[in-house]
């Protein structure tokens, strides 16, 4: 069946990961190693939708501190805000954000911005599946988004994606995203617990520095520019807005690296 592949032992060794590390509850894999692990799993199991179905059954509590923080939030809107705000402590070389479209629909966008990670399809599919289940934790197992977007080309077994998300799925898009109506944001989370939320946030902040800090501002500026290039060369103000810093801060960081805006 579709979920049978989930119980197959993942090929840690082939992905460059020591098997005895697999059970460590606070294990933090480099994003490149994580992506290799799931691409290799899909290859060895000959199940091209491995990441899709892995993410589909991955519950928010399986996300560790990050997941517990989200489901402890008072409303779904604050749960998604918690996910995006704490993402920098969970994973580097990537972004997670929620933006409102002109038509009022919301986009929960996820993308890896490290150019050296080329094979990233499995990661994208399992990640959106995880985020879907955070929303379903609040709205119920039958809730579905309006649309789902993936940046990779349409695979052969693409109808599985529409079954997994119960929604139209579009491929070769600018980013990976769940598109949904905003009227669900005020719904209360069933496991809301402000005290637990505070503890989880504090633990994540103390366990390690923000991955954005680890990536370095200069690297984040370059990644933000690359991300916008398909839509034309971005302005300094656009990049500053994306990074939530002032245009002057962007210019100072470039100057510190003896680079101009166009060099970056």
Regions found by a protein language model. Name each.
Residues 3-7, 18, 48, 141-144, ...:
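Short coil/loop linkers at secondary-structure junctions
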Residues 79, 127-130, 196:
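Internal, well-ordered alpha-helical segments in soluble enzyme and binding-protein domains
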């Amino acid at each position: 069946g579709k979920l049978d592949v989930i119980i197959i032992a993942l090929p840690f060794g082939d992905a460059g990961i020591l098997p005895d590390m697999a059970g460590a509850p606070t294990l933090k894999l480099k994003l490149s190693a994580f992506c290799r692990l799931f691409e290799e799993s899909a290859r060895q199991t000959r199940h091209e939708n491995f990441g899709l179905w892995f993410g589909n059954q991955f519950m928010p509590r399986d996300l560790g501190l990050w997941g517990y923080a989200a489901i402890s939030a008072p409303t779904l809107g604050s749960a998604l805000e918690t996910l995006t705000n704490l993402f920098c402590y969970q994973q580097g070389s990537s972004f997670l954000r929620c933006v409102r479209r002109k038509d009022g629909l919301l986009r929960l966008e996820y993308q890896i911005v490290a150019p050296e990670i080329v094979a990233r399809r499995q990661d994208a599919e399992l990640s959106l599946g995880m985020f879907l289940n955070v929303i379903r934790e609040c709205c119920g197992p039958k809730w579905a988004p309006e649309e789902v977007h993936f940046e990779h080309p349409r695979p052969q077994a693409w109808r599985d994606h529409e079954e997994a998300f119960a929604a139209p799925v579009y491929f070769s898009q600018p980013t990976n995203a769940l598109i949904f109506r905003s009227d669900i944001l005020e719904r209360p989370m069933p496991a809301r617990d402000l005290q637990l939320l505070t503890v989880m946030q504090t633990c994540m902040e103390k366990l390690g520095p923000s991955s954005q800090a680890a990536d370095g501002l200069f690297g984040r500026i370059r990644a933000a520019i690359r991300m916008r290039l398909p839509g034309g060369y971005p302005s300094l103000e656009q990049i500053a807005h994306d990074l939530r810093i002032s245009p002057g801060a962007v210019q100072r960081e470039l100057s510190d690296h003896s680079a101009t805006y166009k060099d970056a």
